Design a protein with these regions (language model features):
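Hydrophobic core of transmembrane alpha-helices in multi-pass small-molecule transporters
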Residues: 27, 95, 106-120, 225
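Residue-level signature of mid-helix packing/kink "hotspots" within the transmembrane helices
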Residues: 34, 62-70, 120, 152-154
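Helix-loop-helix hairpin linking two adjacent transmembrane segments in secondary transporters
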Residues: 144-190
Length: 231
């Protein structure tokens, strides 16, 4: 049998592989999430969108991402965090394909809603990385994973460059390539058994609503809402 020290070394070695992959996935997902914040101006002129239509296009990824955060977290508990992360990345890749092929407002609106899968990736990713680390490293691991939100900032620099060099379609094509690459690396380099579902976890809506009624949960939701809203 392995000693406690050996098990700790195994977890640390696993974390050294899992954390960079999870961060890379979140960087790309965050970039997809805010894609229309940069490229939306081009689409607005190309499709001759009204102010209301343009507002819907910008709001859809954020609204869907917020709506998916809790269900994705529950699904990660029930079906496994790794599986939900892979589904979210595959969904984001499908959105890039839609962006490459559509030329209508409804098509772009569907893709914008699909970009909200980035919120689901974030929820599942939190469970994925915390399952590979000890409690004494939890703060550092969560901080490193959360830093993946810098992918949203990269958009403001990289998207205009790709747009000028390759036209608008170069942007979703570049994201599609990176998404497929990260997806393949996650499949090949992570073990499904490391992120199995927890059969003892309570994931019913009733239990969730009961937990949300606690004062502490309400405070944390409020804090995160203010911080995320400011972002």
């Amino acid at each position: 049998m392995k000693s406690e020290t050996d098990r700790a070394d195994d977890r640390l070695a696993s974390l050294a592989v899992v954390l960079p992959l999870a961060v890379a996935g979140f960087v790309v997902a965050a970039g997809c999430w805010t894609l229309f914040a940069v490229a939306g101006v081009h689409l607005r002129s190309e499709l001759a969108l009204s102010d209301l239509q343009f507002g819907f296009l910008l709001a859809m990824p954020m609204a869907v991402g917020a709506a998916l955060a809790v269900p994705a977290g529950l699904a990660a508990q029930k079906f496994g965090a790794r599986r939900i992360m892979l589904i979210c990345l595959a969904g984001l890749a499908a959105c890039m394909v839609i962006l490459l092929t559509t030329d209508t407002f409804p098509g772009y609106l569907v893709a914008a809603g699909g970009l909200g899968l980035a919120g689901g990736f974030y929820s599942a990713g939190l469970q994925f990385v915390t399952g590979h680390c000890e409690s004494k490293r939890l703060g550092l691991v969560l901080g490193v994973f959360g830093a993946g939100v810098t992918g949203a900032g990269f958009n403001y620099y990289l998207v205009p460059l790709f747009h000028e060099a390759f036209s608008w379609h170069g942007v979703p094509l570049a994201y599609l390539i990176v998404l497929v690459l990260v997806l393949a690396l996650l499949v090949m380099l992570t073990d499904p058994e490391d992120a199995e579902a927890d059969p003892t976890a309570e994931t019913s809506v009733r239990v969730l609503l009961h937990r949300m009624q606690t004062r502490r949960a309400g405070q944390l939701c409020g804090y995160f809402g203010v911080v995320a809203g400011s972002f």
